[in-house]
């Protein structure tokens, strides 16, 4: 996962003047009958944040963003400081845990875990006369597209003779033309959002015709949904979640295999990988980490130390003071790790629960030396 979208957040680090970040993950799902529940949930979160030291102007700024969310919005992540919201992200699912936190650094780990579940894709519910598409980008701003094909002739009849053969041929041609039209719109939509895969549902013949008409690159990323249902229906959602999990796991296992191959090399100079929090911090401080693999434990309260630069990260304040950081500050280790990875353009990969993790659940793969690049 690339973390560049977080840089605007870290440009407003709260350590400089002692103020901090308000981080809120809120379930905003509601209907007309339960609209007040969102307000009650926010009121409870606000009380916790105020007790932790968050200022009124920042809490008011968050309140303005929390209220008035549309009923279909399952959840919201908001990060604010100094009376202003620095980043707001709609969530595709209700947050697993509603979190309210006030600290020097924003608490972004739950957001990244939610984004891990969101791989950009396109859903296609095809019929002989057209299709309904749903584009699902990473940012959660889904959009529906209607493809209208030729409406006649699309049904075969048994009349016999020459006229029947002509009609049958016309029907076949209409099906093929409509499938090509659907495929063209699908390919454009996939390119627009950088889709990793395309789900195609509908009757077996229609699915096959659309998939066969897709450009090769999109066709290779097509997954069938054996149901004739709208693209926002449960079968499509289940298929999207399964394909997302499969792809994420494949990416993470590939990184982990690479890490294992490197860390096991006999010559330390050839390993180009480190493990453990201290090792990962050292690689990030030096700008050597290409990617970080992590098995996150949501219940972990391990802390670490940071400084004014994004890459200032260490397991002890003494380490940073030895590097010239005059006033290190303490925060959760995962918050400091993500900040350092973002600041040095390192990618982040979450390891599946059944993977054998590096020491302390954290490893870093190092960039190739400049002479080898």
Question: Which residue stretches match the model-derived regions?
Answer:
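Terminal alpha-helical anchor/extension segments at protein ends
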Residues: 1-373
């Amino acid at each position: 996962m690339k973390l560049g979208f977080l840089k605007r957040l870290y440009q407003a680090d709260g350590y400089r003047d002692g103020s901090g970040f308000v981080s809120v993950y809120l379930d905003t799902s509601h209907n007309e009958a339960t609209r007040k529940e969102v307000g009650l949930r926010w009121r409870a979160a606000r009380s916790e944040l105020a007790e932790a030291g968050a200022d009124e102007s920042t809490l008011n700024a968050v309140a303005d963003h929390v209220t008035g969310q549309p009923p279909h919005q399952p959840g919201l992540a908001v990060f604010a400081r100094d009376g202003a919201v620095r980043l707001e992200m709609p969530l595709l699912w209700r947050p697993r845990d509603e979190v309210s936190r006030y600290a020097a650094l924003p608490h972004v780990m739950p957001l990244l875990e939610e984004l891990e579940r969101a791989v950009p894709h396109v859903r296609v519910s095809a019929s002989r006369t057209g299709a309904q598409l749903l584009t699902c980008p990473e940012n959660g701003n889904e959009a529906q597209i209607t493809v209208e094909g030729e409406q006649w002739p699309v049904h075969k009849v048994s009349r016999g003779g020459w006229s029947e053969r002509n009609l049958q041929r016309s029907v076949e041609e209409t099906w093929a033309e409509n499938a090509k039209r659907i495929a063209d719109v699908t390919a454009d939509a996939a390119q627009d959002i950088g889709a990793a895969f395309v789900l195609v549902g509908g009757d077996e013949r229609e699915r096959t015709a659309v998939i066969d008409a897709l450009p090769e690159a999109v066709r290779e990323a097509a997954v069938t949904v054996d149901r004739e249902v709208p693209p926002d229906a449960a079968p499509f959602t289940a298929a999207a979640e399964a394909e997302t999990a499969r792809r994420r796991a494949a990416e993470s296992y590939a990184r982990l295999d690479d890490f294992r191959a490197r860390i096991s090399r006999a010559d330390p100079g050839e390993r180009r990988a480190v493990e453990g929090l201290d090792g990962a911090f050292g690689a990030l401080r030096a700008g050597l980490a290409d990617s970080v693999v992590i098995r996150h434990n949501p219940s972990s309260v391990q802390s670490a130390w940071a400084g004014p630069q994004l890459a200032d990260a260490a397991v002890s304040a003494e380490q940073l003071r030895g590097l010239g950081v005059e006033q290190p500050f303490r925060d959760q280790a995962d918050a400091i790790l993500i900040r350092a990875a973002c600041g040095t353009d390192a990618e982040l990969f979450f390891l599946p629960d059944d993977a054998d993790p590096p020491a302390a659940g954290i490893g870093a793969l190092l960039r190739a030396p400049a002479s080898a690049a």
